[in-house]
A protein has these predicted regions:
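Short acidic loop-to-beta-strand element that houses the catalytic metal-binding Asp/Glu
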Residues: 24-42, 133-134
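A conserved beta-strand-loop-helix scaffold within acyl/acetyltransferase catalytic domains
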Residues: 85, 89, 94-207
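Short acidic, S/G/P-rich loop/turn micro-motifs used as interaction or catalytic elements
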Residues: 44-50, 78-80, 182-183
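Conserved beta-strand-loop-alpha-helix junction that forms the acyl-donor binding cleft
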Residues: 210
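Well-ordered, non-membrane alpha-helical segments in soluble/globular domains
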Residues: 5, 51-59, 190-196
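Catalytic cores of nucleic-acid endonucleases
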Residues: 51-82
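Short beta-strand-loop-alpha-helix junction that forms the active-site gateway
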Residues: 34-56, 164
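Acidic-basic catalytic patches of nuclease active cores, encompassing PD-(D/E)XK
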Residues: 1-21
Length: 210
């Protein structure tokens, strides 16, 4: 039986992604030769190993020393139970997904049912009830590296926010969920949705903190 790290290696080979192994004090990373992303496989025995405090300190040190490099943590249970989502997320960080530019999208308020259905398919933790729900709809394409689209505006990303709580004179909101269409990277999507939400609350005369 192959290890979880070997499973990920086989997946990378399927997509012809060059990589190398890096081991730091017993923790094995796989580094993409394509864009330098560090992949940290977390198997089912990860939290049962000796000296978890040392491991946590080591991971913090690695993050500090490689602050210019993206580190992706892949959990074995999610890899097996959410195959499409976890693999799509990994490919996105490796720069191998289709791209859609947020500037070619419009934002609309969506229903709880729309948000829940989209998140159930495209977010590892599924949907959740939220006070505010917004969808990013693709309206046009500009060609180039952007993927082709149908004529009808398509829901490509969803963001949800909680009800506000007043803290020190500010209305504090929690960003509960964000997900893009599986297999697709929305360039600028998170920023566009967040800015829209903040500006809308400010227009209502509220001081906002997220």
């Amino acid at each position: 039986m192959i290890s979880f790290t070997q499973e990920i290696e086989l997946f990378l080979k399927e997509y012809s992604i060059g990589h190398k192994f890096i081991t730091v004090e017993g923790i094995t990373f796989i580094q993409s030769l394509h864009n330098g992303v560090l992949i940290c496989p977390i198997d089912k025995n990860w939290f049962e190993m000796d000296n978890p405090l040392h491991k946590g300190e080591l991971m913090n040190r690695i993050r500090r020393e490689h602050s210019d490099v993206t580190i992706i943590y892949i959990y074995e249970d999610q890899w097996h139970f959410h195959k499409t989502l976890t693999r799509g997320r990994l490919l996105s960080h490796l720069g191998l997904q289709k791209s859609i530019f947020a500037r070619n999208c419009i934002i609309k308020e969506i229903s709880q049912e729309q948000a829940a259905a989209f998140l159930q398919k495209n977010h590892i933790y599924g949907g959740t009830k939220a006070k505010y729900r917004y969808g990013l709809f693709r309206k046009r394409a500009t060609g180039g590296q952007e993927t082709l689209m149908e004529q009808t505006p398509t829901l490509v990303a969803v963001a949800t926010f909680s009800s506000p709580k007043e803290i020190d004179g500010y209305m504090s909101y929690q960003w509960e969920r964000y997900a893009s269409l599986c297999g697709t990277r929305i360039v600028g999507g998170m920023g566009k949705l967040l800015n829209y939400f903040v500006e809308k609350q400010l227009s209502l005369g509220q001081s906002v903190e997220i």
